[in-house]
């Protein structure tokens, strides 16, 4: 159990914090200032984020995840939003890997992904809808203040 806690702290929390400070807090901000095109800055930082993970088959999902974190930062104005999202994502991966390595209901975990294409599409649509709704809520909040 202590190995899980140590992994969540190192891989989940510290890596999420460090990567977001670099990719969104520094790189995306520099790109925004230099390019003056916020969407291009988000996607440039996401591209570099995905490329520097050096995983060919995970490039596109990581690119989308990087863009998600980039827009979360852009729209919220707070680096803590993508830091928390990144830390939660990394911590979930660590926890699932730990459960798989410790044979904790591995059969049920395998069945959970049997509809992965449908689940991935539905998840992507719901995520985009939530991001658009979040942006609208932020825009409405700024108009009333």
Language-model-derived ranges and their functions:
Residues 1-15, 29, 33:
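Juxtamembrane helix-loop-helix connectors linking adjacent transmembrane helices
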Residues 22-31, 60, 84-85, 92-93:
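Active-site-flanking alpha-helical
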Residues 9, 60-67, 88, 92, ...:
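Membrane-embedded alpha-helical segments of multi-pass membrane proteins
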Residues 11, 38-53:
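Small-polar-interrupted transmembrane alpha-helices in polytopic inner-membrane proteins
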Residues 18-44, 71-78:
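Membrane-interface helix/loop boundary segments of multi-pass membrane proteins
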Residues 87-145:
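C-terminal membrane module of polytopic membrane proteins
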Residues 44-48, 64, 84, 88:
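Hydrophobic residues within alpha-helical transmembrane segments
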Residues 1-6, 61, 110-118:
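Juxtamembrane helix-entry segments on the extracytoplasmic side of multipass membrane proteins
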């Amino acid at each position: 159990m202590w190995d899980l806690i140590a992994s969540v702290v190192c891989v989940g929390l510290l890596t999420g914090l460090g990567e977001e400070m670099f990719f969104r807090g520094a790189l995306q901000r520099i790109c925004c200032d230099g390019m003056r095109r916020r969407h291009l800055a988000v996607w440039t930082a996401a591209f570099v984020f995905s490329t520097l993970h050096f995983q060919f088959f995970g490039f596109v999902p990581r690119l989308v995840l990087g863009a998600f974190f980039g827009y979360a930062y852009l729209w919220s104005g707070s680096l803590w939003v993508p830091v928390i999202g990144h830390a939660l994502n990394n911590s979930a991966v660590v926890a699932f890997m730990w459960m798989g390595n410790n044979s904790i209901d591995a059969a049920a975990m395998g069945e959970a992904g049997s509809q992965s294409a449908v689940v991935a599409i539905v998840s992507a649509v719901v995520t985009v809808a939530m991001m658009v709704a979040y942006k609208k809520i932020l825009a409405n909040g700024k108009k009333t203040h």
